[in-house]
């Protein structure tokens, strides 16, 4: 998963030899083109073993179901377990032991609210903050419902990888248009021009509704770029409105002009 890859990248950058063992596919939630770029350009020093299980784990080695013995200190990044024991007899839990809440972040016990990782769902700091604000407003008798729509996410590597998808847009493959371009050198990427590792951006459009379906960006500025683009997706802005932005150079202004020319 994402956390495993982030931790692996840290140790690899520090000079360690790193193996990632994935029970299914590594980064399966990432667009295939973006994943290929990540493996080739950002994680090239890391050995990735997919469709592999660990059958034996010792202090300084692991043995896989493919009879491979890998030496080194094992580091587990297999997800989180909700620490909900303290309220098990007070509120109702989901099958995975997370707290069951409604869209106002209220648990099954009236006037008891919960937010963040303990409720399951998106285990991201900004989402936990959004849930906490929703819960606080409802506690203060300001009715508010949490909305999980076009949630931006990032994979923190030596170059940030950010992505967002409008899951409410069910455009067909016939109506979907994909545009991918290399990253344009800018702050944080000037010295990568010679290697060609300036990043990559891929955007999927719904040509019928004139809306953005999905954005994937590998860029030093992708965290902020995708964050505000996700807001435009949440308020259902058509593509034409994206051209009204006047941005500070150098940022995404050049990217927008290129993508617009390719689309039109």
Predicted regions and their residues:
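Cysteine/selenocysteine-centered motifs that mediate thiol-based redox chemistry or coordinate metal-sulfur cofactors
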Residues: 144, 235-264
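Mid-to-C-terminal Rossmann-like scaffold of FAD/NAD(P)H-dependent oxidoreductases
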Residues: 118-223, 261-264
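A short, polar/charged loop-to-alpha-helix boundary motif
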Residues: 222-235
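Short loop/edge segments at beta-strand edges and connector loops
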Residues: 50-52, 58, 95, 181
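Conserved beta-strand-loop-beta-strand element in the redox core of flavoprotein oxidoreductases
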Residues: 57-68, 74
């Amino acid at each position: 998963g994402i956390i495993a890859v982030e931790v692996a990248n840290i140790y690899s950058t520090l000079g360690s030899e790193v193996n990632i063992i994935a029970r299914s596919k590594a980064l399966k939630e990432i667009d295939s083109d973006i994943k290929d770029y990540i493996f080739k350009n950002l994680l090239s020093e890391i050995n990735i073993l997919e469709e592999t299980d660990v059958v034996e784990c010792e202090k300084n080695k692991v043995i896989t179901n493919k009879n491979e013995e890998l030496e080194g200190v094992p580091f587990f990044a297999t997800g989180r377990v909700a620490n909900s024991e303290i309220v098990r007899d007070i509120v109702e839990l989901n099958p995975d032991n997370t707290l069951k809440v409604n869209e106002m972040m209220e648990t099954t016990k009236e006037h008891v609210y919960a937010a963040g990782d303990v409720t399951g769902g998106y285990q991201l700091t900004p989402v936990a903050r959004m849930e906490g604000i929703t819960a606080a407003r409802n506690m203060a008798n300001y009715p508010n419902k949490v909305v999980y729509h076009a949630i931006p996410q990032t994979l923190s590597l030596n170059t940030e990888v950010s992505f967002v998808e409008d899951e409410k847009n069910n455009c067909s493959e016939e109506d979907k248009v994909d545009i991918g371009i290399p990253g344009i050198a800018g702050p944080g990427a000037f010295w990568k021009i010679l290697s060609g590792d300036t990043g990559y951006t891929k955007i999927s459009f719904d040509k019928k509704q004139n809306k953005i379906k999905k954005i994937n960006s590998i860029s030093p500025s992708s965290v902020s770029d995708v964050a505000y683009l996700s807001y435009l997706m949440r308020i259902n802005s058509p593509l034409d409105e994206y051209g009204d932005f006047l941005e500070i150079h150098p940022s995404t202004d050049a990217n927008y002009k290129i993508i617009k020319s390719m689309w039109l």
